A protein has these predicted regions:
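Acidic/polar loop-and-plug regions of large Gram-negative outer-membrane beta-barrel proteins
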Residues: 68-141, 164-178
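Active-site loops and adjacent core secondary-structure elements that bind or stabilize anionic groups
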Residues: 152
Length: 178
C-alpha cells in the first residue's frame, strides 16, 4: 500500500453535510497503518423532525515480521442517531369526541411530522433511533508452504441500538404518561 491521505467535504440539500479524513502510512519496515474518520449531519431534512447525525471510523494496523506471517488488527464502527417521521394517515383521524387522534397529511402537509414538536421551547421527537455496534478483529495469515496456508480471525462485536416511541409493550410508554 502506498502512503497518502485525503480530506473530503460534501454538502447536499436539506442541510446534509459530510466530512471525511483518511490516511495510510504505507508499509514502514514491517508495519503499516490506515485510519478513516467520517462525520455526517442533517438537522433540517425534508420532513420536519427527521434530523440526525453519525460518525464512522476505521483503524487498521498491520505487522509483517517475515514472508510467512502477517498480522492485522482492525477496529471499525459507525455510531448514529436520527429522528423518524413514523407513518401517518393521509387524512386526519379523530376520536369519538371529535378531538384529533392522529394528524394526517391534510393538516401537517407533506413535510409535517406528527411525532415531532416543541416542549418548553425545545424541539422534541417521539421517535429517535440510535445504534452503535463496533467490530474489532485480529487476523493472522500464515503461509505454511507453497501449497498450504492458514488464515485465522479472532473478532468481537458488542454494541447497542434501539429507538424511542410510544408503541410497543413496555412497562411504561409515552401514551401512558397522561
Amino acid at each position: 500500500l502506498k502512503q497518502g491521505g485525503f480530506v473530503r467535504y460534501v454538502a447536499g440539500n436539506d442541510s446534509y453535510q459530510k466530512a471525511t479524513v483518511g490516511y495510510n502510512t504505507g508499509m514502514k519496515g514491517k508495519w503499516g497503518a490506515s485510519i478513516l474518520l467520517d462525520y455526517w449531519t442533517a438537522h433540517r431534512k425534508y420532513a420536519r423532525g427527521t434530523g440526525g447525525e453519525g460518525q464512522s471510523y476505521f483503524v487498521s494496523v498491520g505487522y509483517k515480521p517475515n514472508d510467512r506471517h502477517q498480522f492485522n488488527f482492525m477496529l471499525f464502527g459507525a455510531p448514529q442517531e436520527h429522528d423518524q417521521n413514523y407513518s401517518k394517515p393521509l387524512v386526519t383521524t379523530k376520536n369519538s369526541n371529535g378531538t384529533i387522534n392522529t394528524p394526517g397529511y391534510d393538516i401537517t402537509g407533506r413535510k409535517g411530522n406528527s411525532n415531532y414538536g416543541f416542549y418548553k421551547g425545545e424541539a422534541l421527537s417521539l421517535r429517535t433511533n440510535y445504534y452503535h455496534k463496533p467490530v474489532t478483529n485480529l487476523n493472522w495469515d500464515y503461509t505454511i508452504n507453497e501449497n498450504a496456508s492458514l488464515s485465522t480471525v479472532l473478532y468481537a462485536s458488542m454494541g447497542r441500538g434501539g429507538g424511542t416511541g410510544n408503541l410497543g409493550r413496555g412497562l411504561f410508554s409515552l401514551s401512558q404518561s397522561g
